[in-house]
Amino acid sequence: ATWLTGSYDPELNLLYWGIGNPGPDWNGDVRPGDNLYTSSVVALDADSGTLAWHFQFTPHDTHDWDANQIPVLIDREWEGEERRLLILANRNAFYYVLDRKTGEFLHGNEYSKQTWATGLDENGRPLEIPGMEPSYDGTLVWPSLQGATNWFSPSYSPDTGALYVSIREMGSYYFKSDVEFE
């Protein structure tokens, strides 16, 4: 599910939507694997609705860090070449730069305190730290349940080349409980 309005590129005729997290939120035992398309951005053909590509920010999300942020579309030079980019500060505390035509991961870095990953690999997949999953006794993790950012509208300035986004630096205790879920 989506929370907010997506973004549209009229030249590529693609719609970009941030997708919510899988359920149940804090017990991933009942939903093994990456939980494809959740906590992701999807690019859809505006006429047919056909999936063009997707990028998953938080595979097997057990911290409620869905990708509800509005994807920001910019055209600018990237490594000496003019590119169509999608930029997004995700709730998981990482900032991402993607090619908005192909979904290719170009860059990512931490923008707020986080304690659950050592960084991102060459494909943008988080390098998770063992023991940061929710537990029956509670696990203290940054960012919090509210994320490093949330549904607040971001803004990009072509003058400064910067993305402006509200940031939260707080942690939460994540508790796992047994749930029946279908």
Region roles according to the model:
Residues 1-30, 40, 66-90, 150-155, ...:
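Repeat-blade elements of multi-bladed beta-propeller folds
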Residues 28-67, 74-82, 94-140, 171-182:
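Extracytoplasmic/lumenal domain signature
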